[in-house]
Amino acid sequence: MVEVRPAVPGDEETIASLILEAFAPFRDEYTADAFEYTAAKADRIRERFDEGPMWIAEIDGQPVGTVSGLPEEERFYIRSMAIKPSAQRGGIGQRLLEVLETFARDAEFEKLYLYTTFVLPGAKRLYEKNGFYVLRETPPEEWYNMGGLEMEKLIEDVIRS
């Protein structure tokens, strides 16, 4: 059973390792700069604790996935969704998205959004299955010479006062 917990200071190496392992199979399809940015090192993960929440998915106490978020005005940015290759297609990404969306809804954000690359068609399918739609294609010059997609989802049931 997948359990998702909030990441805490001290989880930086675990998160960095999960991200690297998840994206390593795509290293040759990324530009060097894009891969370096995507496969965030522990020191950069440490900085993210001040920027927004992070979660770790575990099976039997073993970390198998991670995701983080960045609160903005009306939108909540999803970044660094990463699932260990050996655990992919097991509902972990789905569970992480559910936890993240619940957090964003409870915080009264109106939308979730993310960027993904064309080299990750499985990620795009997961996001579309969860109600995300493509806002626009992002040109290569916008992100480390890699084209991609900006995707968004309206969060239902957000009550504004």
Question: What is each of the regions a protein language model found here?
Answer:
Residues 7, 81-83, 116:
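Hydrophobic adenine-recognition pocket in adenosine-nucleotide-binding enzymes
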Residues 56, 62-70, 77-82:
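Conserved beta-strand in the GNAT
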Residues 46, 110-161:
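C-terminal "cap" of GNAT-fold acetyltransferases
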Residues 44-56, 77:
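A short helix-loop-beta-strand connector motif used in the catalytic cores of GNAT acetyltransferases and
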Residues 83, 89-102, 128-129:
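Conserved acetyl-CoA-binding loop-helix of GNAT-fold acetyltransferases
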Residues 3-17:
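A short beta-loop-alpha structural element at the N-terminal edge
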Residues 17-45:
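Conserved GNAT-fold acetyl-CoA-binding loop/helix
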